[in-house]
Structures are given as structure tokens and as C-alpha cells.
């Protein structure tokens, strides 16, 4: 296994560990999710380049679109919660339920 794949797997694992440990704030959770998506994007790009299959080159672009949508929704939720409560705690998300 190449060293770059090991580095990407370590980056994904560290982001996942950060998401599990620092889940009290919305901003830290969003940053960990972005790190995971970045690792998946680089990994899928490398796999698509190594496969040399033309249709596989669309997979990283689709993943990037989903990452952008996730970031936009997460930031809008962060702005809404911080404007309403003045804090970015995940515990405030339970108050949004009807």
C-alpha cells in the first residue's frame, strides 16, 4: 500500500476521532466533517486516476458537490443557532424541535 493512501486514511481517522471527541460545539463538528470529506475527496480522486476509467472521474466531483451542500447547510444552521441563542452548542439543537 502506498504511503499516500496511509496518510489519507490517517487523516480520515483523525477527523473522525475529532468529531467523536469534540462534539459539544457545532463549529468543531463542522470542521471535523470537512476534514473527513476532504480525505474522501482526495482518496476518490486518487482511485479514479489509478483506475483510468472515464466514468469514475465523475465520482470526486459528485462528492465535492455533496460536501459543498453539507457545508452550506451546516453554516446556515450555525448562524441560526448563534443568532437565536448566542452560543454554538450542539445542545441548543434539541430546542429547535417542535
Swiss-Prot record:
Its main location: mitochondrion. It catalyses: a ubiquinone + NADH + 5 H(+)(in) = a ubiquinol + NAD(+) + 4 H(+)(out). One of its GO terms (cellular component) is respiratory chain complex I. One of its GO terms (biological process) is ATP synthesis coupled electron transport. Its EC number is 7.1.1.2. It is found in: Mitochondrion inner membrane. GO terms for molecular function: NADH dehydrogenase (ubiquinone) activity. Keywords: Electron transport, Membrane, Mitochondrion, Mitochondrion inner membrane, NAD, Respiratory chain, Translocase, Transmembrane, Transmembrane helix, Transport, Ubiquinone. The keyword Iron-sulfur does not apply. The keyword Coiled coil does not apply. The chain crosses the membrane at residues 1-21, 29-49, 61-81. Core subunit of respiratory chain NADH dehydrogenase (Complex I) which is composed of 45 different subunits. This is NADH-ubiquinone oxidoreductase chain 4L. It comes from Procavia capensis (Rock hyrax). The gene is MT-ND4L.
